Regions:
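N-terminal export and membrane-targeting signals
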Residues: 1-11
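Active-site beta->alpha N-cap acidic-glycine motif
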Residues: 49-136, 232
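CE4/NodB-like, metal-dependent polysaccharide N-deacetylase domain
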Residues: 109-116, 134-161, 195-204
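Post-signal peptide N-terminal segment of mature Sec-exported envelope proteins
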Residues: 29-55
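C-terminal motif of bacterial Sec signal peptides marking the signal peptidase cleavage site
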Residues: 15-18
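Acidic (Asp/Glu)-rich catalytic clusters
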Residues: 106-113, 123-124, 130, 168-170, ...
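Bacterial signal peptide processing site
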Residues: 20-22
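His/Asp/Glu-enriched short active-site or ligand-binding loop at hydrolase and phosphoryl-transfer sites
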Residues: 159-196, 223-232
Length: 232
């Protein structure tokens, strides 16, 4: 079993936090010179159209998390599949087996649409740690976490027990992240609650080629994509 940090797959954190925009050569010519310059060729296609969306994704609001997730016991990290918030956002998460970072189309889409997604780097072929003794679980979790240590953990297959939470807490984990909705069958399925996307839902996406279809559904519900780390 190998655990790695959840990473914001915006192909560098600058895409999530904002970076200095490039200066177009026409801007450097000055206003009068720029008026004499006419761009050549057709206008570039808007990224959202290139990826099959009819409108750009709405920008995520300034995060306003609700009450913190409740822990099942003192010192134990909470297990979350939904964030309590009034913000109309959902959270897109990917496991390692989705090959999100190995799919060039996926990484291009994330970069061009500036999607704040989270990948949990749990290695393929891993077995659940639930049921193992404390020392074994702690070794698996602490021993294989990437540096710097992550705050969030997705246990293999989403299975865990109280020992998993104790071991995770001792490894510096602040929350175990599951999902309320998933696309593992190619369509959205729900672990509990309403059979529709609702604000605060955490979505597990695999395979990655279902992302665009999901984004259309998110827009139809009047939602957008938020950054999970801003709410946990």
């Amino acid at each position: 079993v190998r655990f790695r940090a959840p990473v914001a797959v915006a192909l560098a954190a600058t895409l999530l936090t904002g970076c200095a925009q490039s200066v177009d050569p026409i801007e450097r010519l000055g206003k009068k010179a720029a008026q004499r310059v006419r761009p050549h060729g057709p206008a570039p296609e808007q990224p959202y159209r290139h990826w099959g969306l009819t409108a750009p994704l709405a920008p995520a609001p300034k995060p306003s998390p609700g009450p913190p997730a409740r822990s099942a016991g003192p010192g134990l990290p909470p297990v979350v599949d939904h964030i309590r918030t009034r913000d109309r956002v959902v959270f897109l998460t990917y496991d390692h087996e989705a090959s999100a970072r190995r799919d060039p189309n996926f990484t291009d889409m994330v970069r061009e649409l500036r999607l704040p997604v989270t990948e949990f780097g749990t290695a393929q072929g891993r077995r659940p740690v639930a049921g193992l003794p404390y020392d074994a679980q702690r070794t698996e979790i602490c021993g294989h976490l990437a540096r710097p240590r992550p705050r969030l953990l997705r246990p293999p297959d989403g299975t865990y027990d109280t020992t998993t939470r104790r071991a995770a807490a001792d490894c510096g984990i602040s929350a175990l992240v599951l999902w309320r909705a998933s696309t593992t069958t190619g369509t959205l399925t729900y672990a509990r609650g309403a059979h529709r996307l609702t604000p605060g839902d955490i979505v597990r996406i695999t395979p990655t080629d279902t992302t665009v279809r999901l984004l259309r559904g998110i827009q139809e519900r009047g939602l957008t994509v938020g950054r999970l780390e801003d709410y946990l």
